[in-house]
């Protein structure tokens, strides 16, 4: 009697393709994506070639660090890789990828190749082909699995990164290079620090401008803006607490615990000490701003003086060359002129003509014997 069996697919352990003499480690459990890597991918997508002959998505390499056991990777930077893609084939500039990877690892020796990214959530045979390229022992991350990061860059849509690793799923050896099974792995984006947040706020300030530009604020202006934001957050918190006390809003235990934890971190100092420290901080900021402007003025003045000095030297040299040419044309006018004449080239005074001397009469010869 025939027995019906459900179709099933046997998957091997999610590792890179095995090779003789290599032992592969376990797949990463968590992928950490730094904000600067996401910003680099978005910049690559915005600056792509939008001609009809080019691909609609862009690809690039992921560079970062990996833990010793290989269970956690951190994507710190990326670089773009030129490629062409159509319905029949995909071509990747392998030589460019090798050179850029060598330069990146030379600048950051502790980092390594982690995988690749693309600006489309679609997974097809071309994605498997590129994934196997980045996971190969010759050009990829072997013995560690290559991480594939997909991210949508559609205008107006939310940024939704997804991370995958691959497992071999080929039916025949002939199709092993262009087929694999993508397995999604968890990822996280760490909270930004103060410097990253300030940079992102400065970039986002130009979203409402038609020219998409934003001026760089000075230290005093940045301090004033941060104070305004702090006062605004305090006002909103005070309004929320007041509404909860008046039973106008439902209380939140999580939010109350968060506020209590932050208030417990506040230093227990009086208002006079806070005002004194704040005034000292203001003076330090003003002093730094003054020194910065002074240094900028000195550098500008030094450049102007150096430029003026070079201009004077050029004019002086041109004047000396002109004098030399005029002096060379006046020489040789009088062939018998003595070298230098009378110091300073003075002319001789004309001499008075001499009176002719009287001719002497010839004497008669004496006779010998006298």
Swiss-Prot record:
Membrane-spanning residues: none
Keyword Cytoplasm attributed: yes
Keywords for this protein: Cytoplasm, Initiation factor, Protein biosynthesis
Keyword Protein biosynthesis applies: yes
Entry's localization field: Cytoplasm
Region annotated Disordered, chain positions: 313-370
GO BP field: formation of cytoplasmic translation initiation complex
Record family assignment: Belongs to the eIF-3 subunit F family.
Record text on subunit structure and interactions: Component of the eukaryotic translation initiation factor 3 (eIF-3) complex.
The protein, known as: Eukaryotic translation initiation factor 3 subunit F
Organism: Pyricularia oryzae (strain 70-15 / ATCC MYA-4617 / FGSC 8958)
Lineage: Eukaryota, Fungi, Dikarya, Ascomycota, Pezizomycotina
